[in-house]
Amino acid sequence: MSSFLSKRFISTTQRAMSQLPKAKSLIYSSHDQDVSKILKVHTYQPKGSAESSILLKTLAFPINPSDINQLEGVYPSKPEKVLDYSTEKPSAIAGNKGLFEVVSLPSGVKNLKAGDRVIPLQANFGTWSTYRTCESENDLIKIEGVDLYTAATIAVNGCTAYQMVNDYIEWDPSGNDWLVQNAGTSSVSKIVTQIAKDKGIKTLSVVRDRDNFDEVAENLEKKYGATKVISESQNGEREFGNEVLPKILGPNAQVKLALNSVGGKSCTNIARKLSPNGLMLTYGGMSKQPVTLPTGLFIFNSIRSHGFWVTANSKRDPENKRKTVDAVVKLYRDGKIISPKEDIRTLEWDVNNLSDEGVLDLVNRGIATKGAKNMVVLKW
């Protein structure tokens, strides 16, 4: 009898040890332009066990435009909807990027330990959740030596900036090479100027006209290393382009790269500043206007125009994604670049005290706040 009870106790204990903690996630099973109609808070018991799965505790996740576009159903990359979360309909967990802490891991995992901070290697990970599980350490990238905000956004802002500057142009170290970019106040642009400065590349950043233009320009030049900041009206003025710009660039300047995340007239005007054989990379379209380029730039200046999508790059070459993250982390740790933290708006998710309705309201407010860069930080 005692032997039977002993075996039963051991069996019960083993099951208890194997069970993963319940996760609370923001899920969706359909799409809508009004994402508040389809986003739900759902608590479920994750599949798998502590002996087979890496258990991750979420520390923070950004609310990016790509996350919202996925919920709307208009983003090219979408997670598969599945029945793994104890839902009536196939569902997906929202969120692509985020920072996690390793809670526990199977004995076979060699390169991670409890307490390590990690980010997903690929998109569609489902980061808007208290806990996530991962079956392979190869699907994670370890992050050390940078702050929470930087780590949670590095896969988007840092990797985008680094790859655009480093992977497309053969730069001349003489100091005469330039790049031009619109959306000069964006987080990506602020990182671009710093990476470029570290490589000896000069930057011309274009920003929207505003009452405090001089203040904004001074901040971008002194804090983030832009060589020169101009307004969109200057960007489009023929007189400025013919008379003032050559003095800014210098006699031997080569504008080899244009970075476009706006489209429309802004895109046309930065393309006009490219030197012959220059390249324009388009990585966004904030104006929702098409990329419009004069025919003469192609025929007489032989410029090139390509799209850039960091998600596709990561999927095509995962190893380069790892190398990019490592390189960007090193730049941060060496003090070569800093994160534009003043742009961020922090939303706190108190895991132990915030109700489901409160969590949903918190995230929906972050989604609805136009122009803000929202970061949800989980308080444990």
From Swiss-Prot:
One of its GO terms (molecular function) is NADPH dehydrogenase (quinone) activity. This is NADPH quinone oxidoreductase. Homodimer. It catalyses: a quinone + NADH + H(+) = a quinol + NAD(+); a quinone + NADPH + H(+) = a quinol + NADP(+). InterPro entries: ADH-like_N, GroES-like_sf, Mito_Enoyl-ACP_Reductase, NAD(P)-bd_dom_sf. Keywords: Mitochondrion, NADP, Oxidoreductase, Transit peptide. The keyword Transit peptide applies. Residues 1-17 form a transit peptide. The keyword Calcium does not apply. Belongs to the zinc-containing alcohol dehydrogenase family. Quinone oxidoreductase subfamily. GO terms for biological process: fatty acid metabolic process. It is found in: Mitochondrion. The lineage of its organism: Eukaryota, Fungi, Dikarya, Ascomycota, Saccharomycotina. Its EC number is 1.6.5.2. NADPH quinone oxidoreductase that efficiently reduces 1,4-benzoquinone, whereas no activities are found for menadiones and methoxyquinones. It comes from the Eukaryota. Disulfide bonds: none annotated. SUPFAM superfamilies: GroES-like, NAD(P)-binding Rossmann-fold domains. One of its GO terms (cellular component) is mitochondrion. It comes from Kluyveromyces marxianus (Yeast).
